[in-house]
Amino acid sequence: MSVLEQLGALDIGTNEQVDETLQRIADEEAKVNEKLESLLAKQCQIEAKMSGIGRSLSLLHTVDSDSNKLNDQIVNTAQLAESVSAKVRRLDLARCRASECQQRVHDLIDLHLCSQGVVKAIGEEDYEKSATHIARFLAMDQQLLRRTADDVQGSITSVSDAVKTLEDATEKTRVLIAKRFDEAVKADDLASVERFFKIFPLVGCHRTGIEKFSLYICQKLANKAQKELRNAQDIAKAESRLQLAYADRLTAILENFARVVEVNQPIIEAFYGQASSSLIDMVSILQHECDTEVKNLLMEFNKNRQIQYRSKQVNESTQRSAGGGNLGSNSIQALGHYRKPSGGSVDKLNPKEIDAIIAEITVMHARVELYFRFMRRRLQVHVETCVPEKEQFDIMERYEKIMKNSDLRRQMQEILSTYLLLERYFMEESVLKAIGLDTYESGQQCSSMVDDVFFILRKSIRRALTTQSINGTCAVINNVAACLDGDFVNALKAPLKSGYPSGYIDLAQAYNAIQTSLQQGKLHSSDADRGRANFLVQLNNADISTEYIETLCQTMEQEIAGTFPQTTQVERQMLDSCLTELKAVRDALKATVDFGMQQLRSSVIKPRLNPWINQFLNYSHNLNEEELAAYEAGETFVQFFIVQLDGLLNSFKNSLSPRNYDALVSILATEVTIQLERAIKKISFNRLGGLVLDQEVRALGSYLTGATSWSVRDKMTRISQIATLLNLDKITELSEYWNPENNKEMSSWHLTPNEVRTFLTLRNDFRIEDIKRLQL
């Protein structure tokens, strides 16, 4: 809207309206002036830009002209390239046709040469040359030959005749080669066998060649294996390896089959084609024969080593042991057998008789596992270097299937089962024998049983590792855990359950002692001494056994990692589960140690502490200065008490293992604080009596701390706090120890507020009203 239109729309009938309108016009004029000034200020910039645009227009005309020229050149180049490309395609087509024509000519020439040469070679029995001609003929495209004959007038008859000649020659050569190969096999002419084996793929008989050659090798290996098996004992005797005679024969059999694959793999790859399945075909045939030879060997092994008879003995013995396990506590050690009842007479298999057999079985199983790994590695290298990637998985899967379904694998599973049966029997019976023959000399802390038992167990586990079987190793570890948790732990617990013969004995322990004396005969005067020594020795045995198990677990983890470096997650979980079972036995042994220590507590510590602590009641703790001086000048209670404790601990110091001795001191400290607290509650104190008690508690704590490498501070905390309460000068001093702003260690107090008040009432110089007013 213009200014005039705005003026026309305004009402200017009065002076005020005229002034208002004039003001609006002035404001509008000011705005217009500001815009004009802003535009005029940009005049130089606008003129500079317009000048630049003018200069650029001339350059744009030049660019437009050059762009048009470039476009014309590109169009011409594209047309030229399309023309050249068409000519190149026509030239390439012509070259391909010329090459095809040349190939047809060469095929025709080779066809005639081969048809003529093959007849001559067959007549001269030059099978290599005839096979070469046939291989060239088989490599030709038969349909292409016929099209060539149709295209070349007058040649169809000659081409057909040549093809017919070569086809007949191929069949004839195949028959002759097979016949000559069979004759070479009958004549045992290895050179001729290998000669014709290399000719088979040239005439297109890859499968036939592999089968015939593999069967020939199988026959040779079978004859050799039978001869060696008949002379196995003589060979082993000559080599001083009678105990490993059959393991050595098995090793020789497997090495022979593995050597055949290793030696002939390059020949097969060179003559039968790298990408073919000829090698896996040979492995399949050889494996079948290997199964047969190993089966014959194991039959002879089972017969001469009396495996079935010994297994039957083991099973019967196991059943009898299981039946005898229900005899309960009446079972005693007799005839070297822990679980065998007294007077029993059982014809049992001596573990030493099967020790050598077990060792031989482990060697046999390990050799088979090594054979499987070797064959897998040879096939893996073959497929990775020679077989197309898309076929590698199929060939390896076929190999795994062959080995998985082989009779050798099944027989190894059976022999592994036999091994586990015999190994378990050997381990359990050897452990029981070690327990039955347990001896210890005076001054020793442990008996011979611990070292003997763990030597046997380590031997069994390491022997299991040599089988190269994860399942077998896990089974043996589980058997070790069961053996320890059963016979071994029971043997340790038996004397501990009877209690420590110290003269302080409860009714249950007395009953057990009477039962034992009735079973073993009249008690002699030294039976108590032997019982005490045996109790402590078995307690030490249990303690040392926990250390042995920890060492055994650590050693096993290292040896397992070295024996089975590439384990699956499932196999790793199996091994970890077995080790967990073994560690659970360690916990059971710790519980046995705790049980034995509690027996010492009830039989030795508590009965002896009671009269000593009662002496505390004979000393007054309401003292004046003269009585305090007289008390300190004489033998104080704590001096008497420490002498008694020292004598008690010294009687066990050389008999207990360091860890058991520390545990005994810890139990003693606990019992001392409990009984001393009871005694404190029975008497009253004054200020000097509380001071004496505090000194006595400190001296007692210092002695017990110095008597053990373990910390007994926590066990003395409660009694120390009681002594602190009774040693207060004034009842108001308690706030310095109790209030959190004054004592940052308030949470370490082991006394409740009610207990604090109770002990403060023992001070006869503290008023009950003041004690009740305490804010705790």
Swiss-Prot record:
Keyword annotations: Golgi apparatus, Membrane, Phosphoprotein, Protein transport, Transport
Positions bearing Phosphoserine: S342, S345
GO CC annotations, alphabetized: Golgi membrane; Golgi transport complex
Signal peptide range: none
Top-rank taxon, per record: Eukaryota
Main location: Golgi
Family note: Belongs to the COG4 family.
Oligomer status and interactors: Component of the conserved oligomeric Golgi complex which is composed of eight different subunits and is required for normal Golgi morphology and localization.
Name recorded for this polypeptide: Conserved oligomeric Golgi complex subunit 4
Organism: Drosophila melanogaster
